[in-house]
Amino acid sequence: MSKVDNIEQKVIKIIADNQGKKIEEISVDLRFAEDLGVDSLSTVEIMMEIEKEFGVDVPDEEATKIKKVADVVNYIKEHKS
């Protein structure tokens, strides 16, 4: 399994756990608000968990640009040390 696949799987698991969904229900194409029904509080919780899991800092101005699951995966790939 590649590093990217591993990041993607972890991100999907975090979102699924937060939203009470099955992992199979989440894909990188989905949008947080429109497709998954993630509200602003849940978005903050998800981003805090992402920061903790991957050791990355996601400033608020960057977090507001994240609209899809793929955006999270790409952000981690770009900023993970």
Swiss-Prot record:
GO terms for molecular function: acyl binding; acyl carrier activity. Transmembrane segments: none annotated. GO terms for cellular component: cytoplasm. The modification O-(pantetheine 4'-phosphoryl)serine is found at S40. 4'-phosphopantetheine is transferred from CoA to a specific serine of apo-ACP by AcpS. This modification is essential for activity because fatty acids are bound in thioester linkage to the sulfhydryl of the prosthetic group. It is found in: Cytoplasm. InterPro entries: ACP, ACP-like_sf, PP-bd_ACP. The keyword rRNA-binding does not apply. Its main location: cytoplasm. Pathway: Lipid metabolism; fatty acid biosynthesis. It holds the Pfam family PP-binding. PROSITE patterns: CARRIER. Keywords: Cytoplasm, Fatty acid biosynthesis, Fatty acid metabolism, Lipid biosynthesis, Lipid metabolism, Phosphopantetheine, Phosphoprotein. The keyword Lipid biosynthesis applies. Residues 2-80 form the Carrier domain. Signal peptide: none annotated. Belongs to the acyl carrier protein (ACP) family. Carrier of the growing fatty acid chain in fatty acid biosynthesis. This is Acyl carrier protein. It comes from Rickettsia bellii (strain OSU 85-389).
